[in-house]
């Protein structure tokens, strides 16, 4: 954890770096953290998105479900064009677009 943040990380996470309780040391911990989200639905979607935006290093997603029309209004990673696709596949693709540095 001795590596310093690179220029891109400093720019991306600048608002977190100024927080007293996070700073560079905390951000490095976030970047090296691993999370498993079981269920990419009404709670899993926003949790995954916020964790990726915060800079979590690795996120695992588990959900055997497909996207239905009834999911669209409450599961922010999915749109109408995603109906009948795997929740995990679509969520992983969208999360990579948000932060390509996070391993999904």
What are these regions (language model features)?
Residues 1-104:
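Adenine nucleotide-associated cytosolic modules
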């Amino acid at each position: 954890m001795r590596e310093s943040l690179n220029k891109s990380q400093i720019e991306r996470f600048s608002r977190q770096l100024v927080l007293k309780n996070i700073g560079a040391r905390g951000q490095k911990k976030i970047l090296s953290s691993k999370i498993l989200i079981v269920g990419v639905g009404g709670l899993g979607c926003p949790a995954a998105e916020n964790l990726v935006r915060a800079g979590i290093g690795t996120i695992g997603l588990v959900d055997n479900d497909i996207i239905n029309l009834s999911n669209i209004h409450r599961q922010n990673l999915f749109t109408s064009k995603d109906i009948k696709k795997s929740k995990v596949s679509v969520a992983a693709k969208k999360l990579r677009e948000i932060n390509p540095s996070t391993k999904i």
